[in-house]
Amino acid sequence: MKRRLTHLFLTLLLLAAALPVSGQGKIYTRKMRLADFPTKTTKIVLEGHSFLELALREEIAVHWRISPFEFCDLEEYGRLRNSSSYYFLTLAQEDGLAYLILAKGGKPDEKDQLRKPFEVVRMPIASVDNPTGRELVFMGAFLDIIQRFTEEALVSDKVAYAGLESANRIHLRGRTVYLDPDAGDEAYLREEPGALLTISIAPEEPGPKTVCYKILISADTHELLSFERSRYKEPDDARFSDAEARRFERRGATVIR
């Protein structure tokens, strides 16, 4: 039922996008608002020398390919963040988790919808207080996931509104899921074709309002194939369950437990 309601909402939204709105002009969908991305410079915001920032700086130079980019510090970011001439990739922390966030700059009170700021995609990458070190190894994969999503959102409002969860519809036939992190890491490092590894990202301590993420990515192409966000009330919430393994199997994968 939830999926049907979401599909109906998106359909109505896309239909409404073409209609004029009295006193406000045209409604622009997320795809329309993102259309200028390939021609704009993406500012990579870095300040300091944390392991995450060092890894991000190194992997950006290798992996970023979908727009011009420049590095900037927090001072420059403060000056430019209200300009719709730039997109920004930032490292942010929220409720015990670290994220990579790609967002368009602009003034919040801007009347022109095409010049208003908005968040394109938010990728969880690590626990702030209990990092595993895997986030450094997978930084290139996280950047590839952000770029692949952005490319798909440029041509599909369905993807743009669904967010990273849109990956949950992809068939897994002919692929192998490694639930064991060590086995998954080895497959990732050797870029094993058809291998999928699991990544769990959770705050140091569970709580009534905290969340965790469980992610499935391909070892060779870094394609995102499952993205689940859930409440993190106890440690088991961040572990891949037997029920999730069965869901992967129903999508066609072979699961190695």
Label the model's feature ranges.
Residues 1-12:
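Bacterial N-terminal signal peptides that target proteins for export
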Residues 24-99:
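Start-of-domain marker
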Residues 10-11, 21-26:
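Cleavable N-terminal signal peptides
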Residues 24-35, 109, 115-257:
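C-terminal/domain-edge helix-coil "capping" segments
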Residues 97-116:
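Aromatic/basic-lined ligand-recognition segments
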